[in-house]
Amino acid sequence: MEVARGENIRKRKFFDMDIPLNKGIKPISYKNIGINTLPKNNMSRKILFKDKISRDSISKDSLAKDNLSKSSMLKDDLTRDNSPKNGLIGKKRSAPLDISFQNMNSSMPSSTQKRTKILDEEIEDQSTSNENSPVIVDLTLKPSYMPKISRITEIIHKMKELNMNRIEDALPSNKKRNEYDDAKNILLQTMEMDEEDYEAENVVIEDSPYLNASLSEDDTDSSIVEVETDYSEEEKESMSESESSSDDESYSLYDSF
């Protein structure tokens, strides 16, 4: 096959080009590369192929097209610079509108302008006066959060006070704590010993003759003391009659039941 030199051939292979093979560089075989796919700039061609492609291996039409495109670009630039500026491109932008408070105040009515001036003066006075004054942080909270936080702060303050009192009066607090522990132990002991004491008291009541309600016959005989009295015969007869009448009444009542 003949080497294509400057002819208008759309596709060809690397081994058809006049690439020197003396330096041991093997051409890429059997890869079809279109000339239009190559970069248009000669420098980029040289970088891409490392000076292995000569001008003779590239068609003259493509180089002519490159030159024409460059010249047309330059002409377009010149015509744009010299053409009348009717479109947006090439126009000088107008300066942005000065949106300031003065312009806004000019559109406001006089009453609002006076108010804004007074407010501005007050703000300036406050800023100048607060330059050297201490910063006061306002810790006011919203009413919805006030109850919970107030309770928490109260609890914290109480805990702090208790801790401070304990630190300041260490010995009295220890004494109070010991007294409280002693009283607690005594109460527990009494609660535990109540049942045992109750059982022991019952045993003592059963054993002791002085506290027992059921007395024996000997005790009754010894405890009863007969006192002799001098009654007349008439009194004795009246006594016996009264006893007999009481017995008859008791029997009659018993029979009625």
Curated annotation (Swiss-Prot):
Annotated Acidic residues bias: 216-236
Disordered, as annotated region: 74-115, 209-257
Segments of skewed composition (Polar residues): 100-113
Record key words, sorted: Early protein
Residue ranges of the TM segments: none
Induction (record text): Expressed in the early phase of the viral replicative cycle.
Basic and acidic residues bias locations: 74-83
Origin superkingdom: Viruses
Family assignment from sequence similarity: Belongs to the asfivirus DP238L family.
Protein name in UniProt: Uncharacterized protein DP238L
Species per Swiss-Prot/TrEMBL record: African swine fever virus (isolate Pig/Kenya/KEN-50/1950) (ASFV)
